[in-house]
């Protein structure tokens, strides 16, 4: 029984250490991402728009198209459509 507990404890410790290592790697990657955003900001890029583009690129094509159609529908309903401004 004691051997089983020892093996289980070692296995648990291994999982914990792997998770801790991955958490550190995740923090490092997040730091790198912040650096890229900072550099883009310094060069005049709009970070909010970049983040929106990244979010859209993660979506599958059908979901993205559906969201864009809904957004356009809502904007037109509120008189915010660019096309409506052009036709006036």
From Swiss-Prot:
Listed InterPro entries: GapR-like (IPR018753), GapR-like_DNA-bd (IPR046367)
Molecular-function annotations in GO: DNA binding
Pfam family name, one: GapR_DNA-bd
Family: Belongs to the UPF0335 family.
HAMAP family (UniProt xref): UPF0335
UniProt name for this protein: UPF0335 protein WRi_003770
Organism the protein comes from: Wolbachia sp. subsp. Drosophila simulans (strain wRi)
């Amino acid at each position: 029984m004691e051997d089983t507990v020892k093996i289980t404890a070692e296995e648990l410790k291994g999982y914990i250490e792997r998770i801790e290592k991955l958490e550190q790697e995740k923090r490092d990657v997040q730091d790198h991402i912040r650096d890229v955003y900072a550099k883009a900001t310094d060069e005049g890029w709009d970070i909010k728009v970049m983040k929106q583009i990244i979010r859209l690129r993660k979506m599958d094509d059908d979901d993205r198209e559906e969201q864009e159609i809904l957004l356009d529908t809502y904007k037109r309903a509120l008189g915010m459509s660019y096309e409506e401004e052009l036709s006036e």
